[in-house]
Amino acid sequence: MLECLIIGDSIAEGIGQYRLDCVLEAKVGINSRNYVETYTLPESKLTVISLGSNDLGMSNQYTVLYNLRSEIKGSVLWILPANNDEARINILTIANIHNDKVADIRQLSLSKDGVHPTTKSYEALAKQF
C-alpha cells in the first residue's frame, strides 16, 4: 500500500512537483471520465484528487466522481476546481458523504488563466497533507 497518491489533471501534476514522496498519476487536460477509463488506482493511505477542471459540460460527472471515490479505501483530500461550479458542488457533496477533506484553490492565488494555482499556491496546497 502506498503512503500517498496524487491523481488527476494538471493541477495534480503541479502539486506533485512539491510532494516527491507521493506517487503521481496525472495527465494535463484529462477529464474525470477519461481519468477513470485510463488509470487503475493503487491502494494508498492518502489519495489527493484533483479532477473537475476539465469536465465542463460532461454528463454524469457526479456518478463518475462518486464511483471513483467509492474505490478508494484510505483517506481523501479533494482539490476543488476554481472554474467549474458544477464540479465543485458534486465534489463537496461526495466529500461530505465520505467525510473527506477539501482544499479550495479559490482561496489561494491563481495564475492569469484563473484555473491553475500560482507557484506559491501549489506549494501551499502540497503542505496541506
Question: What feature does the model see in each segment?
Answer:
Residues 1-46:
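Serine-esterase "nucleophile elbow" of acetyl-processing enzymes
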Residues 21, 34-129:
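Alpha-helical cap/lid subdomain in secreted, periplasmic
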